[in-house]
Amino acid sequence: MTILNHTLGFPRVGLRRELKKAQESYWAGNSTREELLAVGRELRARHWDQQKQAGIDLLPVGDFAWYDHVLTTSLLLGNVPPRHQNKDGSVDIDTLFRIGRGRAPTGEPAAAAEMTKWFNTNYHYMVPEFVKGQQFKLTWTQLLEEVDEALALGHKVKPVLLGPITYLWLGKVKGEQFDRLSLLNDILPVYQQVLAELAKRGIEWVQIDEPALVLELPQAWLDAYKPAYDALQGQVKLLLTTYFEGVTPNLDTITALPVQGLHVDLVHGKDDVAELHKRLPSDWLLSAGLINGRNVWRADLTEKYAQIKDIVGKRDLWVASSCSLLHSPIDLSVETRLDAEVKSWFAFALQKCHELALLRDALNSGDTAALAEWSAPIQARRHSTRVHNPAVEKRLAAITAQDSQRANVYEVRAEAQRARFKLPAWPTTTIGSFPQTTEIRTLRLDFKKGNLDANNYRTGIAEHIKQAIVEQERLGLDVLVHGEAERNDMVEYFGEHLDGFVFTQNGWVQSYGSRCVKPPIVIGDVSRPAPITVEWAKYAQSLTDKPVKGMLTGPVTILCWSFPREDVSRETIAKQIALALRDEVADLEAAGIGIIQIDEPALREGLPLRRSDWDAYLQWGVEAFRINAAVAKDDTQIHTHMCYCEFNDIMDSIAALDADVITIETSRSDMELLESFEEFDYPNEIGPGVYDIHSPNVPSVEWIEALLKKAAKRIPAERLWVNPDCGLKTRGWPETRAALANMVQAAQNLRRG
């Protein structure tokens, strides 16, 4: 029984973000479709070859996507919303881009499909839309073409296909409501056809992804698996693939299926290998997801070996990444600025392939010397002074309940804040950032590259802050912001100023479409060596008599949008960040900043996959926010900002944050979101976003007024604020001025009654 290895998928964007550049060039009309397709072919060939050279036996094919793999599946099944269809009914790459972006070089623009987080990762997928009576047929043959490509290059191929039940689970019904699971029998014939085509090509194994099997699914959905897989059996061997959590709770459903193998995530799941071996049919292959596909840490391969060695020789076994390597940067070897010690702790996608090769060889031979050598740096890290800061650990251990309580309840604080700020009814403000112009970006880049000295850089930033204050005063806003000209990214900026974080040069991962992010890495205990935002906030406040908000990114968001440590809990990291930012709140307050906003857009998206785990997460997530904020005096007003489409299920926790003011994204839902706050009887102040900053359209005064009147039917007017629904970083100044002028006018009209 020779053990093989495989990956569940590989990053698509290219080491130098070649895919992103090719997509954006094509969208802008600067290159042809043929040139774009050629870049895709070149990247696929390179990535297959790199994995093979790193020692991977079975190469994933079908993991590449022009925008998103769920969207690719929609096209494969012929699920194209009517508004995005070509007039002749054909499907091409522009159809795909119209669904993803709302527009493409050909065809009519139409509203893009909704985008949401892929399970609990920072990757986003395009939500499939389903209508009653929908028809499906094999339409977009990208998967088959790529299998042919890989076979022609002489590779051992394992096609990757998103499974039918997870696909339906991820979608949403449009128009007349019905149970989307009822479409299962309509999509299964397309899956049968695809599997038949793969069988014709001599494919032995197909990786069929059903990550929905790690969720607490309704019984009807669990019951659908058996008949669905009965219909799919017989043409090729199916590796039923799960990830992001364990499968033990749904193992009875899984073991009844007519598949030939099961992949389990042994990093994020708590499944016991011996128990899995005992319960799985003896003729099934077990694919052990031992290498973390969604982090950047080198694995302790001696531990991984120990985890699996007892079942070697007892059943067919493969070793694999826990999930697709899509969530990891590509190659550590191109990082030249990380010091040698820290660099020795990391493994990116290609290094993870090497880890899988080392693990396979050791399991086949019984010789573990190479594993011990590879694991030495990560074992040495446990005792590194770069990781452990006794002062931080001592401070964290000393936290009491008092540290997460404001001195007085909201009603008492609100009184003190009204007396201090004397704001009018319907107070107007913005969420924090103003347009990041080419001048601002060039200024920051020149400084970063060493082409500009610190004095000239600071003079330039001060000028942009001054301009933002002048613009806001001219517009008549009530509470101002400094505009964040000095910040590249709301998480990266804080990470750069906190001890315990490091940054990469090329550690890009795909967020959605052509958007890539370069998350900070938490390598050790987090602390704040010096004030971060105080100087610029103080400067901005010196330019005006109106209050200027201090702007912080909250601890849960910094955690969720970074690569976390693996040796301590997420709760520990969040609370360490909270303590560091608590000192920032105290320093802002001492500098005369009376309104401080702590953004937590990631609070909801950090929720665990299983609802039964939510309470524990929300408890420490809320506590981290409160530790951050509770140092503020009664007359200091704490704001928070959140952008989600769903509040109902976490309203208790949002109220428990005890922020004096919460601003939320509501414009696209036509204020429907406020229903949650009304039903819950939310006690504090609230700023429902009155226009969508993601669109360049300028809202009319009448439209904003109508939205605010609608809001006032749900929330008492004396507790309402007036603001856009998000930061204005990505907008241009002309539409920003016009939209804010209309927003201020609408508020003034309402004050006059």
Swiss-Prot record:
Residue numbers annotated as active site: 694
Amino acids binding Zn(2+): 641, 643, 665, 726
Gene Ontology terms describing biological process: methionine biosynthetic process; methylation
Binding residue positions for 5-methyltetrahydropteroyltri-L-glutamate: 17-20, 117, 515-516, 561, 605
InterPro entries: Cbl-indep_Met_Synth_N (IPR013215), Cobalamin-indep_Met_synthase (IPR006276), Met_Synth_C/arc (IPR002629), UROD/MetE-like_sf (IPR038071)
GO MF, any single term: zinc ion binding
Residue positions binding L-homocysteine: 431-433, 484, 599
Coiled-coil intervals, chain numbering: none
Function field: Catalyzes the transfer of a methyl group from 5-methyltetrahydrofolate to homocysteine resulting in methionine formation.
Record protein name field: 5-methyltetrahydropteroyltriglutamate--homocysteine methyltransferase
